[in-house]
């Protein structure tokens, strides 16, 4: 993979960061095992689940690939109101032996995941919006998107701040 391809795939990283993180990024996002599993599922028309922040081209490219192969795209967007909440969630994940992220990556993911979902929401056959709140509170589903319409859960009286980006869509309560 050329450095230009890497920069397109991971636009939030500088060249120095890519050099330092390339092996980790490959393991985390584009490993051979992932591609092998994905291709087997596509070949055999099996269901496939992908966890991605949808903040870079990787998530979008995978959704486009599966869409092209005739898959229905169902998503769950876990949202937080602030980057500080996101940093706290990553810290909790690390405490539980999960992978860590650089602060620059957390900030990039926080900003660009919402923008990318917003810009490509039409790729989803169904998308559930879940407010993850904070590490001390349980997440809750408050809305679902399908066919250009966002339906709100009657059990949730308000929507979180981060959801304001999606205000242009038609709503049903």
Where would I find each of the regions flagged by the language model?
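Alpha-helix N-cap/loop-to-helix boundary motif
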Residues: 51, 55, 82, 102-105, ...
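Conserved GTP-binding G-domain of TRAFAC-class P-loop NTPases and closely related GTPase folds
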Residues: 88-173
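Nucleotide-state-sensitive switch-loop elements of NTP-binding domains
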Residues: 1-32
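Glycine-rich phosphate-binding loop used to anchor ATP phosphates in small-molecule kinases
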Residues: 21-77, 113
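A broad, low-specificity signal for short, low-complexity segments enriched in glycine/proline
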Residues: 8-13, 33-38, 87-92
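Conserved nucleotide-binding/hydrolysis micro-motifs of P-loop NTPases
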Residues: 55-56, 79-84, 134-136
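A contiguous binding-surface segment within folded domains or other stable secondary-structure elements
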Residues: 66-95
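Generic signal for short, ordered secondary-structure residues
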Residues: 13, 20, 45, 69, ...
């Amino acid at each position: 993979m050329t450095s230009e391809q890497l920069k397109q795939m991971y636009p939030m990283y500088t060249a120095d960061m890519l050099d330092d993180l390339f092996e980790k990024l490959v393991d985390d996002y584009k490993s051979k095992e992932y591609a092998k599993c994905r291709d087997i599922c596509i070949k055999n028309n099996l269901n496939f689940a992908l966890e991605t922040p949808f903040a870079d081209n990787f998530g979008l490219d995978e959704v486009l690939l599966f869409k092209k192969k005739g898959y229905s795209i169902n998503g769950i967007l876990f949202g937080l109101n602030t980057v500080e909440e996101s940093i706290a969630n990553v810290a909790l994940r690390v405490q539980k032996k999960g992978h860590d992220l650089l602060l620059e990556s957390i900030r990039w993911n926080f900003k660009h995941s919402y923008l990318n979902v917003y810009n490509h929401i039409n790729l989803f056959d169904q998308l559930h919006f879940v407010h993850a709140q904070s590490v001390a509170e349980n997440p809750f589903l408050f809305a679902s998107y399908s066919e250009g319409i966002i339906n709100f859960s009657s059990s949730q009286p308000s929507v979180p701040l981060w959801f304001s980006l999606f205000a242009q869509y038609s709503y049903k309560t």
